[in-house]
A protein has these predicted regions:
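Auxiliary Fe-S-binding modules of radical SAM enzymes
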Residues: 1-24, 173-240
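N-terminal [4Fe-4S]-dependent radical SAM core
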Residues: 1-35, 42-53, 71-72
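Electropositive phosphate-/nucleotide-binding environments in soluble metabolic enzymes
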Residues: 33, 37, 58-61
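A secondary-structure boundary/capping signal
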Residues: 35, 81-82
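Hydrophobic adenine-recognition pocket in adenosine-nucleotide-binding enzymes
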Residues: 39, 85
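Conserved alpha-helical substructure of the radical SAM core
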Residues: 49-79
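Flexible, glycine- and charge-enriched loops at secondary-structure boundaries
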Residues: 54-61, 146, 150, 216-219
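Conserved AdoMet/S-adenosylmethionine-binding subsite of the radical SAM
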Residues: 66-76, 86-216
Length: 240
């Protein structure tokens, strides 16, 4: 990538918003969150509706870099989220962030494998939170994207496991969409992939602004039915 392209990418208004401080989104780190516009999925439960459908952002990467200059010794990390952050070319921005001494966490649905691999090959990402949206048989129903994208997600999952990268897996659960058997199917797949790490089950967050206008389900996930028979996978619960 040449310098003029780098400058052009840094000055595109693709940052929907910036959360200046978080101690929750990147464990053991004080971070800011960069929310990237647009997404390649349309999950009904997604509460970032405005970000997902945004064609442009309010800020540029250059604006964020200026902000980071004022946060040295106050923050130590940057979280890239969305939307789907990897819909955008992140290389030049991540290089600048790393050069300033910050770590980078990526939140991703994993279907842009090629770009994720590019970032990892350049050592630009320190940690990944990978969304396992649903088993293959429910992937299209949950994400409103092609089932072919499930295989792209699996390519990312397998690659992260094979290179022993530091990452977590998470699934958002709305009980009208996913049930106990679906979660156990995901756990079976993770066991077959020889995943060793944290698996977060995130309870649906009821907001006024989700894509499918769905409400809290009257059904409940029976946590006792979740198979916890693999000591290598550490199941944790959020918002339960």
């Amino acid at each position: 990538m040449n310098i003029s392209n780098d400058v052009s990418l840094l000055n595109k208004k693709i940052v929907y918003d910036l959360t200046p401080f978080s101690h929750l989104d990147f464990q053991d780190h004080l971070s800011c969150i960069v929310w990237l516009s647009g997404c390649n999925m349309r999950c009904s439960y997604c509460y970032n509706k405005d970000i997902v459908f945004a064609k442009n952002g309010k800020m540029t990467f250059a604006n964020v870099l200026k902000f980071l200059d004022t946060r040295k010794n106050l923050l130590d990390a940057v979280v890239l989220s969305g939307g789907e952050a990897t819909n955008h070319n992140l290389i030049s921005f991540c290089k600048e962030v790393k050069n300033k001494g910050f770590k980078v966490k990526l939140d991703t649905n994993g279907i842009n494998f090629k770009h994720i691999k590019e970032l990892l090959d350049l050592n630009l990402i320190d940690y990944i939170a990978l969304d396992y949206k649903a088993p293959k048989y429910k992937f299209e129903q949950i994400t409103y994207s092609s089932v072919d994208n499930f295989e792209k997600f699996k390519e990312t999952l397998s690659y992260l496991i094979n290179i022993n990268f530091n990452f977590e897996i998470r699934t958002t659960v709305h009980n009208d969409l996913l049930i106990d058997d679906d979660i156990n199917s995901i756990l079976d797949d993770l066991s077959k992939e020889k995943y060793k790490g944290k698996y977060f089950l995130q309870n649906f967050l009821d907001t006024q602004n989700n894509i499918g206008n769905i409400k809290i389900s009257s059904n409940k996930l029976n946590l006792e039915n979740i198979q916890d028979n693999n000591d290598s996978i550490k199941i944790q619960f959020r918002n339960y």
